[in-house]
């Protein structure tokens, strides 16, 4: 097929046309200024590295997500020796506690997230195993797999 690109002062248009003369048009706004340095938010080093089964984690996060609400939408992940405890507690909804086996050796530590922000990248991955790296409860964490993929996720403060 063919692609026709039209650029004006404040937008760009991409017209996609195939052999059957059917097509699609994508229009985007152009913004002024320099592209932000996204590498600044990607942690270069991490204190903790955890390896987990993607499907098992995904199902556990979905179950924990049921026990959250708009006001209290966090799931706490507590990592200990080869064990992950996922907890969510919403007074008007209920409480969830689930454990799963992981590959981790280190001190016990916890971090909390909006579960949907963890579920979204897991849904996009085909790998069976993921690596989660983080430094502390308030710094960004990184989801990695054994290929060029990186997903930065911000934790939530919990009381």
Language model features: what each stretch is:
Residues 41-44:
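Short hinge/gating elements
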Residues 1-29, 46-159:
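DNA polymerase processivity clamps
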């Amino acid at each position: 097929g063919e692609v026709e690109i039209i650029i004006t002062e404040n937008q760009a248009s991409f017209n996609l046309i195939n052999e059957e003369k059917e097509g699609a048009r994508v229009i985007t706004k152009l913004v002024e200024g320099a592209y932000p340095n996204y590498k600044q938010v990607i942690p270069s080093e991490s204190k903790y590295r955890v390896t987990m089964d993607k499907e098992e984690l995904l199902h556990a996060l979905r179950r924990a997500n049921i026990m959250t609400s708009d006001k209290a939408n966090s799931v706490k992940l507590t990592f200990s020796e080869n064990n992950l405890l996922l907890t969510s507690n919403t007074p008007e909804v209920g409480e969830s506690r689930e454990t799963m086996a992981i590959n981790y050796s280190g001190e016990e530590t916890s971090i909390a997230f909006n579960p949907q922000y963890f579920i979204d990248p897991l849904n996009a991955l085909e790998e069976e195993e993921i690596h989660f790296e983080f430094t502390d409860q308030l710094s960004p964490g990184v989801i990695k797999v054994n290929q060029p993929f990186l997903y930065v996720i911000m934790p939530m403060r919990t009381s």
